[in-house]
Amino acid sequence: IAEKLSFIAAEKILDNIDDILEDKATFVDQDHSKATYAPKIQKIEGLIDWTSNAENIIGKINGLYPVPGAFFISSGERYKILKGEISNGIGNPGEVLNDYLEIACGDKKSIKVTEIQRQGKRPQNIGEFMLGSRIRKGHQI
């Protein structure tokens, strides 16, 4: 989403740069009566609840990327999901459905992880990650 917004912002700046340089631009103050406060996002908010529906989980993955990130804990290790997509796999929430890390959600759908980062390690695509991972089909997260 950040990438999409950066392109939109660049286009808007180019559309208005002449007005800005010639002091012809008009600026609108924020209406403070409509402003809201958003508290700082805490790391723990990134913990994935696999009983949630797939849409909410993928929203958390995308919304918290890159920092603090959406994550799960397995065997005492933290794994940050950097990218994923909704799939139609069915299983118990948190169950790994196959050997390329597709994880069941609470709504009879699943999240297929495509990029992941183990705590203290570099980000990896799922193929690289699975070569050295002990997480396999049937594992419960």
Positions of predicted regions on the chain:
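Active-site-proximal loop/hinge segments within enzyme catalytic domains
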Residues: I1-S87
